[in-house]
């Protein structure tokens, strides 16, 4: 993901 806390995207 685009941001560390949304890695799954």
UniProtKB/Swiss-Prot annotation:
Tissue expression: Expressed by the skin glands.
Domain of life where this protein originates: Eukaryota
GO terms (BP aspect): defense response
Keywords: Amphibian defense peptide, Secreted
Location within or outside the cell: Secreted
Keyword Electron transport: no
Chief site of localization: secreted
A single GO cellular-component term on record: extracellular region
Family the entry assigns: Belongs to the frog skin active peptide (FSAP) family. Tryptophillin subfamily.
Role: Putative defense peptide.
Name assigned to this protein: Tryptophyllin-2
Source organism of this protein record: Ascaphus truei
